[in-house]
């Protein structure tokens, strides 16, 4: 598998340019590019779409697609990734950072029985850095979150618009 590429300390346009260059180099173009919409990512997703890339801004703090089971979309995506990893013979990139981050983040249940993923503030209290690689990995399950409960999709002006919270 190819190594994971990380970009740090880039502004919105520099990050957009790096993603566009990566996209242009791909022999097999991604069908969807999911971008964390919190902070810098919202502008990145907007610009990528403007350039014609299939980019979607994901706000993981919003409600999950399967609201009764998860506290928020972040919890839903992390839990879907967990189940996917446990349920299949998978091959992750040979990246120690990603593997470490995936097993570091903990989950619990709320008093109402919803899955809750450890917050960045809780991780920081434990002395754990932000799991950036793992967060990017679990964003790849955003498409599945919409289809898991039959999330509606419609094509308008060449763009896919999903009718679920958190996916723009």
Walk through the language-model features, giving the residues of each:
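Mg2+-dependent endonuclease catalytic cores in nucleic-acid-processing enzymes, primarily RNase H-like
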Residues: 1-114, 156-168
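Charge-patterned, long linear interaction tracts outside catalytic cores
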Residues: 96-154
